[in-house]
Amino acid sequence: MLNDLKLSLQYILPKLWLTRLAGWGASKRAGWLTKLVIDLFVKYYKVDMKEAQKPDTAAYRTFNDFFVRPLRDDVRPLNTDPNVLVMPADGVISQLGAIENDKILQAKGHDYSLEALLAGNYQMADLFRNGSFATTYLSPRDYHRVHMPCNGILREMIYVPGDLFSVNHLTAQNVPNLFARNERVICLFDTEFGPMAQILVGATIVGSIETVWSGTVTPPREGIIKRWTWPAGDNEGSIALLKGQEMGRFKLGSTVINLFAPGQVKLVDTLQSLSVTKIGQPLATAVEATAAAEPAPLPEEEIRAEHRASPLVDDKQDQG
């Protein structure tokens, strides 16, 4: 009964207005009140401020400044093996695995369409049919900048308007085509591992999605698909990003989906749904790589804290 009510609210509540209100409040300078809200947030979600370049919460003029806080350079070591693609974000793996022709796993027993995720762009979808994917959820406690898994040349960016459903265990199980319905920004790159898409997905209360090359992509929310393209390789006007480099950020959280072409990369064997991710740790390896790559083990306390903060974890599950 409670789950039915929560699910009904996802359809009834004015999600766009709630998101606008949250974005407005998070951008306001309110002095001691801003610091109080940040302090309560840090305590509730067990945010590790020792990792931040500015660990003192008084240093942040707005909640947004705190939310997109940069980390110290030494806290996310980058795996520099050229055959290894690294995790793009701190968070938790929602799902990962093979793309079965046009089907991507959303939750156990629930698929959604690759072509729908890519806003009906069948030519782009053809690049990734029978390839692989990884979906990473960023919880409120996480660092909310998104980085490159490998070196890449930006070729295309598409803004897709959509719903703003919350992303959690309940919606993943009950909202069909959740990620293909929500607002999102699709970024297509040429890489040495073939084409790669990195998709930033919005949700309720996600105030904005930004990229390093264009700034704020949304808002404004104009209700139309927008598309930008860039030249390849060393051509004038091309945009190259390096492995581990920041490519975008969320002001309030959400989800990153990576798509990889068939026959190019192999996802790390030990990763599974609810695996905790840290930027710079191995996500996948080139198919011809001879040595396996594994993420560094995390303290159990960190894993428990991440699972407690993640709505992807079913309340009935053992979070320890």
UniProtKB/Swiss-Prot annotation:
Please state where this protein is localized. Answer: Cell membrane
Give a short account of its post-translational modification: Is synthesized initially as an inactive proenzyme. Formation of the active enzyme involves a self-maturation process in which the active site pyruvoyl group is generated from an internal serine residue via an autocatalytic post-translational modification. Two non-identical subunits are generated from the proenzyme in this reaction, and the pyruvate is formed at the N-terminus of the alpha chain, which is derived from the carboxyl end of the proenzyme.
Keyword Protein biosynthesis carried by entry: no
Query: What's one GO BP annotation on this UniProt entry?
Result: phosphatidylethanolamine biosynthetic process
Q: Which residues carry this modification: Pyruvic acid (Ser)?
A: 254
- Which keywords does this Swiss-Prot/TrEMBL entry list? Cell membrane, Decarboxylase, Lipid biosynthesis, Lipid metabolism, Lyase, Membrane, Phospholipid biosynthesis, Phospholipid metabolism, Pyruvate, Zymogen
Q: Which InterPro entries match?
A: PS_Dcarbxylase, PSD-B, PSD_type1_pro
Membrane topology recorded in Swiss-Prot or TrEMBL: Peripheral membrane protein
The pathway that the record names for this protein is: Phospholipid metabolism; phosphatidylethanolamine biosynthesis; phosphatidylethanolamine from CDP-diacylglycerol: step 2/2
Q: Where is this region: Disordered?
A: 290-320
Reaction(s) catalysed (UniProt annotation): a 1,2-diacyl-sn-glycero-3-phospho-L-serine + H(+) = a 1,2-diacyl-sn-glycero-3-phosphoethanolamine + CO2
Record bears the keyword Cell membrane: yes
Q: What's a Gene Ontology MF term here? A: phosphatidylserine decarboxylase activity
Biased composition, Basic and acidic residues: where in the chain? 301-320
Site location (Cleavage (non-hydrolytic)):
253-254
**Gene Ontology CC entries for this record:** plasma membrane
Enzyme kind, highest EC tier: lyase
List, from the UniProt record, the residues annotated as the active site of this protein.
Answer: 90, 147, 254
The record's comment on cofactor binding reads: Binds 1 pyruvoyl group covalently per subunit.
Q: What EC number(s) does the entry state?
A: 4.1.1.65
What cofactors does this protein use?
pyruvate
The UniProt function text for this chain reads: Catalyzes the formation of phosphatidylethanolamine (PtdEtn) from phosphatidylserine (PtdSer).
- What binding partners and quaternary form does the record give? Heterodimer of a large membrane-associated beta subunit and a small pyruvoyl-containing alpha subunit.
Family of the protein in this entry: Belongs to the phosphatidylserine decarboxylase family. PSD-B subfamily. Prokaryotic type I sub-subfamily.
Know the name of this protein?
A: Phosphatidylserine decarboxylase proenzyme
Recorded source organism is: Klebsiella pneumoniae subsp. pneumoniae (strain ATCC 700721 / MGH 78578)
